[in-house]
Regions:
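A general marker of short, structured functional hotspots
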Residues: 4, 27-30, 43, 75, ...
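Aliphatic-rich helix starts adjacent to a transmembrane/signal segment
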Residues: 31-49
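A ubiquitous, low-specificity "background" feature that marks scattered single residues
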Residues: 18, 37, 52-55, 143
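N-terminal single-pass transmembrane signal-anchor helix
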Residues: 2-35
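Amphipathic alpha-helical interaction segments
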Residues: 39-42, 55, 87
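N-terminal alpha-helical signal peptides/signal-anchor transmembrane segments
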Residues: 44-65
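Periplasmic/extracellular, small/polar-rich flexible segments of pilin-like filament-forming proteins
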Residues: 59-151
Length: 151
């Protein structure tokens, strides 16, 4: 009479564990690459959105000034970040913290820097938007937008 085997042998279990380990290693590597690409996309998106929003705001203000409006205030970094670029406060940098910072960009967390210089009256501001070097794939870049031309 032949004995009926119940369960799995040790070698079968070891093979299953080895296959799961190999699949896990591949999945983790792919997930890490996915996270890196998502962080890069986020920083590029914040930078491009900031440029578009500032150009639109400066063009709007230039039109208001040319139509005779005199009550516009001079822009500052805090106003630009809180009211124009991130009014709901939801935008975050890839590694946490705010997406936009007054002053210089922060390469540690991937935050975009906003610096406003220039005139002491509305319509003469110069806005510099800076993207930090982030990870090894994003190079530092900045754009300067002049309020009197919104270019």
């Amino acid at each position: 009479m032949k004995r009926i085997q119940k369960g799995f042998t040790l070698i079968e279990l070891m093979i299953v564990v080895a296959v799961i380990a190999i699949l896990s290693a591949i999945a983790i590597a792919a997930y890490q690459q996915y996270l890196k690409e998502a962080q890069i996309a986020k920083i590029v998106s914040h930078y491009d959105d900031g440029i578009r929003a500032m150009r639109a705001e400066l063009a709007k203000r230039a039109a208001q000034l040319s139509s005779g409006r005199k009550d516009l205030v001079v822009l500052n970094e805090t106003f630009v970040i809180d009211e124009i670029l991130n009014p709901e406060g939801r935008a975050t940098a890839p590694l946490g913290g705010p997406a936009y910072l007054p002053g210089d960009a922060d390469p540690e967390i991937g935050a975009i820097g906003i610096r406003i210089t220039g005139g002491n009256r509305a319509g003469t501001e110069v806005v510099r938007i800076a993207r930090p070097a982030f990870l090894e794939d994003v190079t530092a870049e900045s754009v300067v937008i002049y309020a009197n031309s919104a270019r």
